[in-house]
Amino acid sequence: MYVGIDVGTSMVKAAAFDDEGRQLAVAARPVGLALHGGVVEQDMEEVYSAVLAVLGELASRAPGPVALAGLTGQGDGVWLVDGDGRPVRAAASWMDGRAHELVDRWLADGTFETVFRRTGSAMFPGCPGPLLAWLDSHEPKALDAARAAVYCKDMVFQRLTGRSRPTTDVSDASMPFLDPRTRAYDNRVVELLGLTHRRGLLAPVSDPVATAEAREGLPAGTRLANGPYDLPSCALGAGVTSPGDGLLIVGTCLAGLVATTDLDLTGEPAGLYISTDRPGYWLRAMPAMVGTAALDWVLTTTGVAHEEVDALLAETPPGAHGVRVLPYFAPSGERAPFVEPRLRAELTGVSLESTKADLIRATCEGIGFAARHCLKAAGLTGTLAVCGGGTRSPAWMRLLADVLGRPLRVIEGEVGARGAVLAAAARYGVALDTTTWTEPTTVVEPDPSRAAYYAKEFEDHLERLAQARKRARRD
């Protein structure tokens, strides 16, 4: 039996798989987010307790020897820990917006673009560079007390294994300090962000991913591998490894990723290049800030349950009777496929005749257009896999296939945890049939007439977005 652990933003999960990649059992626990005035934080002890809880539940539901385990989790943010991996302060989430003024300044003075040209990382307020700079100005004592600024999975790995020092991997380190060519930190970028005196906080990069034996949570001595983080782990779990092939993650965030061997640091600075376990191979990532969270907000506001979405999507035609949604709901603006810290969502075309069904369809269409924009910018030329919570809605998957104008290889289940196991197996030299492990649950084909309609609507979406970005810059 193999165990994958996925420490997500709102949910912590552990899944068990057999030798053929069949999912045997899943355990999950929600974790909270504290939101106030653009600040988004998480309690590290709550997160770690949730990890122990799901591992305990999984052991009772799928008893048996564990051959090995893989660990993945949310990326970005700043998780300040002491030498034992325990929190110095609450974790600043990747959704945090407190450092938006720093990003605005770096956009204006050229620092933002310089960093992208060096590392392929388009910074956003919730990534480590701006957050560390903000903390250095406003909470220097917290940085003084910390041994390292790590990422979510790194904190969990250190606690589960009892390792004496924190480390990270090349995937998490990719934003914004890692040089994707040398796979080492770029000290010039550290200097540009005013963090040279905090350089020692950057966790050492373990390349390939770190391994150790578990001391708690898993049976003692279980082999455990740390990484990659959730985006590349999902790509592994969906079988996206050939250049040109892509993955769309329809989760809390909306992420488009395309495998590539071409490191192109020209063009509009946006997204990032995620370094993988294979030097010379990257994932061109366009991780938008908000995916299913946008739909969740609309459902909560309208009093509609998730179970009603499929029926409501059938009640109104493509175009939602003229209702349109620009789905940029994050308090920190947008980070891909462009960076606009002050951009906010827009709802237009609403009248007294508009229905809940119109609002729901318009939101799903808007998210679909944002996904198309991300995948186009990432350079998708091959097949497209889709995973994440959004795949639980067959009607939304059909709508997405139409909006994107291409077949969708839908991968259900715990794809991130699956990818973490595959990464661990590769690290330990355990032979698993990756083709069998990554077979799609189903393939959804687009309707030609609706796909043609949405191709035209996508151009309208881009025009409305351009106007919204202009307004955001004036505010």
Per-range role (PLM):
Residues 1-90, 117, 217-226, 401-408, ...:
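N-terminal glycine/serine-rich phosphate-binding loop of ATP-dependent small-molecule kinases
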Residues 3-4, 107-119, 130-165, 176-192, ...:
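Active-site core segments that coordinate phosphate-bearing ligands/cofactors
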Residues 29-30, 94, 196:
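A generic structural motif
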Residues 60-94, 122-126, 157-179, 204-210:
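Short beta-strand-loop/turn "lid" adjacent to the catalytic site in phosphate-handling enzymes
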Residues 65, 198-201, 380:
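Short loop/turn motifs at secondary-structure junctions
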Residues 92, 96-109, 422:
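Short alpha-helix plus adjacent loop in nuclease-associated cores
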Residues 194-208:
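A conserved helix-loop-beta module that forms one wall/lid of the active-site cleft
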